[in-house]
């Protein structure tokens, strides 16, 4: 289990708006954009948001999204899921990743 620092959801919302919102929505019933809607993300397996067209790499990764998996994925998405179509380079700063995860945990329920 990764040593994940406590995040600040308010700061994480700013990270989401700046780095993620161009391709993702978080609200229940939100539409897919270039990337899938993230509502219900925690506890869902990779490649499983209904109605979104995923790569085989995402569908076949077979992990369940949670703090630990998001921590590793958000640092370097293409390393964690080679073949993903997510073009985001990742968040190298631990505090930004922790804040974003705190925001996602709160906003995608």
Swiss-Prot record:
Family statement drawn from the similarity comment of this UniProt entry: Belongs to the cytochrome c family.
Function: Electron carrier protein. The oxidized form of the cytochrome c heme group can accept an electron from the heme group of the cytochrome c1 subunit of cytochrome reductase. Cytochrome c then transfers this electron to the cytochrome oxidase complex, the final protein carrier in the mitochondrial electron-transport chain.
Descriptive protein name: Cytochrome c
Source taxonomy: Eukaryota, Metazoa, Spiralia, Lophotrochozoa, Annelida
Post-translational modifications: Binds 1 heme c group covalently per subunit.
Location(s), subcellular: Mitochondrion intermembrane space
Pfam family, one: Cytochrom_C
GO MF terms held by the record: electron transfer activity; heme binding; metal ion binding
């Amino acid at each position: 289990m990764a040593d994940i620092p406590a995040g600040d959801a308010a700061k994480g919302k700013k990270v989401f708006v700046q780095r993620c919102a161009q391709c993702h929505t978080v609200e229940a019933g939100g539409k897919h954009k270039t990337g899938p809607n993230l509502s219900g993300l925690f506890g869902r397996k990779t490649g499983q948001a209904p109605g979104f067209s995923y790569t085989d790499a995402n569908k076949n990764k077979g992990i369940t999204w949670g703090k630990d998996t998001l921590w590793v994925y958000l640092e370097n998405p293409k390393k964690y899921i080679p073949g993903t179509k997510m073009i985001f380079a990742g968040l190298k700063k631990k505090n930004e990743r922790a804040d974003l995860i705190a925001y996602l945990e709160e906003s995608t329920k």
